């Protein structure tokens, strides 16, 4: 019979299928249970959403909540636009859609140039030498089948008269693993390929709110008889 056992090869420990010692003679071995089974599926999925946007300016602080929005819209009064600070809170959800537990060892956020990062409000994130944001807080947290782990990331945009429009932010699973070293069935971590389910984009559209002025005039009609 075959059992699963941890085997170390060149200081690399993995699980392998191991049999008892099989002695080969001049006779054939029959009824050997090799225990071959089809590999379980490993599949981690990542989705990125906008969960909250906070606007700070001379008029005060306003907070707008969003429910799993991947296209969030925000309007700022034209008189308050320049100098407004916009804090965008993203929710990154990693879900195990496969058949065996696994790990999201590293998450990467490809921060766009119009957003700024602060380590003071993002304790689990850091800027790497590649210029991107990285998070390894889930390295040792097993994600069971059907389970979802959630990360948050808050980025800041300082508004001017000329930088309204769409901000696109993408996150991806940079490294993933499982005890059987089975690769993800439909994604390659960290390869920046759109369309794979370990990568997701959230967009924020910031526009100007303009007031409408109504003028009521008086029409005088003179009738000459």
What are these regions (language model features)?
Residues 38-39, 86-93, 139-166, 175-178:
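Low-complexity, intrinsically disordered segments enriched in Ser/Thr together with acidic residues
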Residues 1-15, 51-53, 58-67, 103-145, ...:
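A surface/secretory-pathway sequence property marking extracellular, secreted
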Residues 7-10, 14-24, 29-71, 161, ...:
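Extracellular/luminal low-complexity Ser/Thr/Pro-rich, glycosylation-prone repeat/linker regions
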Residues 19-24, 78-79, 137-143:
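Beta-strand-rich interaction surfaces with strong enrichment in secreted/lumenal proteins
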Residues 40, 96-100, 111, 159:
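Short, acidic/polar linear motifs in exposed loop/turn regions
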Residues 213-225:
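A cross-kingdom C-terminal cell-surface attachment/processing module
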Residues 72-103:
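Short beta-strand elements of extracellular/lumenal beta-sandwich folds
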Residues 34, 48, 90-92, 107, ...:
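Extracellular/surface recognition and adhesion modules
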């Amino acid at each position: 019979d075959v059992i699963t056992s941890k085997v170390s090869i060149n200081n690399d420990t993995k699980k392998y299928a191991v049999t008892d010692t099989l002695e080969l003679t001049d006779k054939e071995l029959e009824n050997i249970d090799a225990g071959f089974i089809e590999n379980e599926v490993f599949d981690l999925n990542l989705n990125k959403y906008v969960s909250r946007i906070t606007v700070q300016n001379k008029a005060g602080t306003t907070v707008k909540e969003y429910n799993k929005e991947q296209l969030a819209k925000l309007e700022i009064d034209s008189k308050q636009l320049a100098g407004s600070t916009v804090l965008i809170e993203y929710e990154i959800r990693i879900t195990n859609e496969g058949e065996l537990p696994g790990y999201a060892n590293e998450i990467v956020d490809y921060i766009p140039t119009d957003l700024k990062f602060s380590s003071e409000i993002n304790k689990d994130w850091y800027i790497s030498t590649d210029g991107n944001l990285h998070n390894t807080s889930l390295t040792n947290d097993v994600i069971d089948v059907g389970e979802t782990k959630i990360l948050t990331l808050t980025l800041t945009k300082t508004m001017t008269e000329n930088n309204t429009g769409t901000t696109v932010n993408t996150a991806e699973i940079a490294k993933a693993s499982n005890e059987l070293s089975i690769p993800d069935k439909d994604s390659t971590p960290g390869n920046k390929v759109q369309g794979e389910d370990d990568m997701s984009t959230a967009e924020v559209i910031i526009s100007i709110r303009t007031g409408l002025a109504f003028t009521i005039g008086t029409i005088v009609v003179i009738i000459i008889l």
